[in-house]
């Protein structure tokens, strides 16, 4: 049995790499700079300044009402509540996506 990659518009796989928090955003920035192609990059953060310098194609500021763009202050509970607040934005970014890779540092509040 042979396997191959089909070509054509119906065979395109929509892949997203999502960087969450400062560490995840750093990974996304590095992947963009290295020329990684064939994927869409999304930066997700509570810190508005970090998003402003992100190289990601799509940027989602989560917890805008809760953190006022100031970050989660290394508090995972603030990060969780921020994600819940922005659930609809996150879901919209994932529409029509076939595969998602999430990168996060796991050392602060958001990632």
Where are these regions (language model features)?
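Tubulin/FtsZ superfamily GTPase core signature
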Residues: 1-111
């Amino acid at each position: 049995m042979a396997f191959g990659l089909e070509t054509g518009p119906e065979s395109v796989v929509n892949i997203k790499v999502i960087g969450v928090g400062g560490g995840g955003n750093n990974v996304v920035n590095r992947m963009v700079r290295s020329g990684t192609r064939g994927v869409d990059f999304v930066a997700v953060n509570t810190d508005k300044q970090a998003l402003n310098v992100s190289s990601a194609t799509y940027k989602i500021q989560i917890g805008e009402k809760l953190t006022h763009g100031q970050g989660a202050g290394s508090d995972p509970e603030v990060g969780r509540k921020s994600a819940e607040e922005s659930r609809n934005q996150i879901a919209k970014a994932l529409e029509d996506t076939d595969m998602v890779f999430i990168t996060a540092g796991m050392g602060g509040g958001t990632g």
